Amino acid sequence: MKNTSLIALFCAVLMVVPTTARSEAVATSADPRATAAGAEILAKGGSAADAAMAMMLALTVVEPQSSGIGGGGFLVHFDAKDGELSTINGRETAPATARPDRFMGLDGKPMPFVQAWQGGHSAGVPGNIRLLADAHRNWGRLKWAELFKPAIRLAGKGFVVNKTLESRLEGVARFWPNFDAARSIYWIDGKPAKAGDVIRNPALATTLKTIARKGPDAFYKGAIANQIVDAVTTSKVSPGDMTLADLAAYKAVEQNAVCAPYRVYVICGMAPPSSGATTVLQILGTIEQFDLKALGKDDAKSWHLIGQAMQLAYADREAYLADPAFVDVPVEGLLDRSYIAERSAMIDPMKARADYPAGNPPGAKPRTAAISGERYGTTHFAAVDANGNIANMTSTIESVFGNQVVAGGFFLNNELTDFTFAPEKDGAPVANRVEPGKRPLSSMAPTVVFDRDGKAILALGSAGGKRIIMHVTKTLIGVLDFGLPLKEAIGLPNIFFGSGALLVEENTPLAQKIDALAAFGQPVKPGDLGSKVNAVQLVDGKWIGAADPRSEGTAMAVDGKRRLRLIDGGTIEGSAPSASVH
């Protein structure tokens, strides 16, 4: 599907260049086993979309805390032959019986998050399998069943628990007495599995084999659908109301990409209900008047300016962005150049402002801002095939291990907690409130960058909940403004704004400049702002890949002779297994 969003702007700035040149193929993800699955598919002659699909399925097995077939995601795809940029929205939907007060307590106040998070009532109808099916129909090269083989192998034969999974299992252990199915897979001898243990998941292997053999409908109808509905409605904690009809009715949505110029580039991403592209592009547009290249990455002023632009854009995000099937979302107004200039003029280069109101973009109806929350159970992966096609996808089950409910060996999401809990503010309906069939607002931001000649040169995304937007923005600035190598740009310090202060990633060079940042007139605090960025970049005519140094991710290349080569990150095999096998 051709990109037609902001079409006048897009055509004025960029003519996308088709290319048929062959080069090394690249896959990157947050887990080496998933990266290897993508590279395996590329080595078999698979397309970028095929490789992304294999990575998503493998991540269901080896990174169950972050994503999987029980969740949803967003895919941005670039077809190098005809220059088409397409996106698929696989965001979860609220059940047909969902109501705006779903997460309101009996006292009329929003529930505490921990009460809303766990159990069947927070589960949205999963979208990932439909997304993958649409992508495979449009751009797949290998057979559907072939793409499941690496994940089936990992689930059936077992995989080694890494430090990240060990840590996440320890973090939720106190909740799992209520979640028998989760314990049966991930606990050994009555305790959470440790790094070096081997986990086998035969139930998930069976589920994957069924979908591989019967196709995507096997997930949304029949035995697997029955398992999902049963797990949701009989959950010991907060049972939900998802039905077989909800699953059968689910459809992924092909949308127009959202694109805008930044300096000599054009940057594109997902339309709402993803807030990623709109907010990233607002931030970049707002700081474009400032010469970040001259200031450099080591000047506190650069980060002051980026932080102020972030606050302006997030104020608009909370007021205007939601599912466009339910709410008029003024994307073009939010990215209008005159409006961006008006917002940018509010920034004082020498003095921070603690709070910015939402603006009044062209074409927007007055809207009440309301804060929505997002947790960090998310992952990103990307692939470029030998023909230069790009598949760039962010996938999530929302919180760590989703809602903790397991069906068919996989975790279900708690995506409905991405809706704003309080449906009204000051007597007016909130844009991102719960409604039947609605898709909650997301910060997932799979992003593709084109150069001045219209050539795709960079694709990236990240995990991190509401911070995803800043992780992606920071990396873009690192590459496009500071001129850093991709890995170094990903490794730049993360910042965010929360609890009335500018938060700076602890144990980074920027954390040593807190006094300099505070001199601009706002509180600054160190914080744990870890990220999981994965990206591919065209450098001197050759695609490279990189994974966040904070993660256990990797990137692999496949050459013209279909030989695999690790180009970033650690070993593919992971830690040697201990004697404990589950």
Predicted regions and their residues:
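Bacterial N-terminal signal peptides
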Residues: 7-17
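Noncatalytic scaffold domains of N-terminal-nucleophile
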Residues: 22-36, 40, 46-49, 53-214, ...
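Active-site rim segments in enzyme catalytic domains, especially the processed small/beta chain
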Residues: 61-65, 72-78, 82-87, 238-243, ...
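Internal maturation/activation junctions in enzymes
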Residues: 289-396, 523, 548
